[in-house]
């Protein structure tokens, strides 16, 4: 045990020696700042000299704490609503520039002034009503003028105003109208599916077509005009056929186009082609047919008069709005001989109704006959009886007698009137 204790003491002594030697070696190896200067000066160090080791100059400093990343707040475009305190401060700072409006004193009107004001307002209202009525009548007139009937188809042309919107009627020159009618043909019994392109191609072999106008159109709706219905192809469901006027650029082309009369343009539609200028001779070659069934069509009427002769055209007068027949129509033949045969069909039945067949008479001639009663229906004038007498005869005409004025004579005192006799004096 004593040996073990001595050994431990020895080991501890050796460790102490080694640690002291290490301290000395480290002191010898480490250079202190100012050690050379101290050796030259004899060991005296100036005040304020450094005592740190040289290794401290090259040693790395202690690591600082890493910087903390702080995000930058984003700027918002929305305006910040001011707080209640800021609003109160702003109201306090703003000076009161506007003065409060002064109250206007309202004058009290007397009874006479009130009556006068009421009369003036009533007159103003009456003037406004008159202006509105005039405007309404003007619109109705313009609408009625804008409508084109079958009879006015060739008498009136549509032209654009300066603004290019509203269309108005412009009457044509009579000479220009006559020349235009000579190169215009009437085409009847066309199907409702026929358009301008088809009709132009149908007549293009005879000459160049200037214009095509569809007539006898029944709109599908009451608000649509005839022209707009023809453009949009919106016809009445009961309408099966329409008519058209084809204007050629040359008169010869219109005459050649008459060859298409009776041609079949579609299944069940045999068209009628005639010159629009030949209206004077139609009256002699046509008959008036009355008491027609309202639902009759042109083909049925044509078949009824087919045995009389070749038919040029058949027309049934219809209601322009509903398309229902009005109960009468016209049949145009090629010659007057067929008219005599057609008149024999008077009181014949068609679809359960007895027809009334008579000659077609021009309305203008009929008016002239009614105005001149001396003219008979056959056109011959009645002979006027003149009273001519001989010289010896006692009777005289009123125009032949010429009288003379009588001269008044003054009565003489002694003259007696004729036929008077003296009255006997009464004896006293």
UniProtKB/Swiss-Prot annotation:
Cross-link Glycyl lysine isopeptide (Lys-Gly) (interchain with G-Cter in SUMO2) maps to which residues of the chain?
Answer: 240
Q: Where in the cell is it found?
A: Nucleus, Nucleolus
Instruction: Give the N6-acetyllysine positions (modified residues).
Output: 147
CDD domains linked to this entry: RRM1_RBM34, RRM2_RBM34
Question: Which molecular-function annotations from GO does this UniProt entry contain?
Answer: RNA binding
Query: Which positions fall inside the RRM domain?
Result: 183-278, 285-362
Post-translational modification Phosphoserine, affected residues: 286
Q: Where is the composition biased (Basic residues)?
A: 408-428
Q: Which UniProt keywords apply?
A: Acetylation, Isopeptide bond, Nucleus, Phosphoprotein, Repeat, RNA-binding, Ubl conjugation
Domain of life of the source: Eukaryota
Region entry Disordered, spans: 1-106, 127-152, 361-428
**What InterPro entries does this protein map onto?**
Nucleotide-bd_a/b_plait_sf, RBD_domain_sf, RBM34_RRM2, RRM_dom
**A Gene Ontology CC term for this entry?**
nucleolus
- Name a biological process GO annotation: maturation of LSU-rRNA from tricistronic rRNA transcript (SSU-rRNA, 5.8S rRNA, LSU-rRNA)
Assigned protein family: Belongs to the RRM RBM34 family.
| Family matches, as PANTHER family | EUKARYOTIC TRANSLATION INITIATION FACTOR 4B/4H (PTHR23236), RNA-BINDING PROTEIN 34 (PTHR23236:SF25)
Q: What is the protein's name according to its record?
A: RNA-binding protein 34
């Amino acid at each position: 045990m004593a040996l073990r204790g001595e050994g431990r003491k020895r080991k501890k002594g050796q460790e102490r020696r080694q640690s002291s030697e290490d301290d000395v070696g480290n002191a010898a190896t480490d250079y202190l700042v100012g050690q050379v200067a101290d050796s030259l000066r004899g060991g005296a160090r100036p005040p304020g000299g450094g005592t740190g080791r040289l290794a401290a100059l090259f040693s790395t400093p202690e690591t600082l704490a890493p910087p903390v990343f702080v995000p930058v707040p984003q700027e918002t475009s929305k305006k910040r609503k001011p707080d209640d305190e800021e609003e109160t401060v702003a109201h306090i700072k703003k000076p009161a520039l506007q003065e409060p409006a002064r109250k206007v004193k309202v004058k009290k009107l007397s009874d006479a002034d009130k009556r006068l004001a009421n009369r003036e307002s009533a007159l103003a209202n009456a003037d406004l009503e008159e202006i509105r009525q005039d405007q309404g009548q003007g619109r109705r007139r313009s609408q009625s003028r804008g409508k084109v009937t079958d009879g006015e188809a060739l008498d009136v042309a549509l032209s654009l105003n300066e603004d290019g919107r509203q269309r108005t009627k412009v009457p044509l020159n009579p000479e220009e109208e006559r020349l235009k009618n000579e190169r215009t043909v009437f085409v009847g019994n066309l199907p409702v599916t026929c358009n301008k392109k088809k009709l132009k191609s149908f007549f293009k072999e005879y000459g160049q077509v200037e214009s095509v106008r569809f007539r006898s159109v029944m709109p599908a709706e009451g608000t649509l005009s005839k022209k707009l219905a023809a453009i949009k192809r919106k016809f009445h469901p009961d309408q099966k056929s329409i008519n058209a006027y084809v204007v050629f650029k040359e008169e010869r082309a219109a005459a050649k186009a008459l060859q298409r009369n009776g041609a079949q343009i579609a299944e069940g539609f045999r068209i009628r082609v005639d010159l629009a200028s030949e209206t004077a001779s139609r009256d002699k070659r046509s008959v008036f047919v009355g008491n027609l069934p309202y639902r009759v069509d042109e083909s049925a009427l044509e078949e009824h008069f087919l045995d009389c002769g070749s038919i040029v055209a058949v027309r049934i007068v219809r209601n322009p709005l509903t398309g229902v027949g009005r109960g009468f129509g016209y049949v145009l033949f090629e010659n007057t001989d067929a008219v005599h045969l057609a008149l024999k069909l008077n009181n014949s039945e068609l679809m359960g109704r007895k027809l009334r067949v008579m000659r077609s008479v021009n309305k203008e001639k009929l008016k002239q006959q009614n105005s001149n009663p001396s003219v008979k229906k056959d056109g011959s004038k009645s002979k006027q009886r003149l009273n001519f007498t001989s010289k010896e005869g006692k009777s005289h005409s009123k125009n032949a007698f010429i009288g003379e004025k009588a001269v008044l004579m003054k009565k003489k005192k002694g003259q007696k009137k004729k036929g008077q006799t003296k009255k006997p004096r009464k004896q006293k």
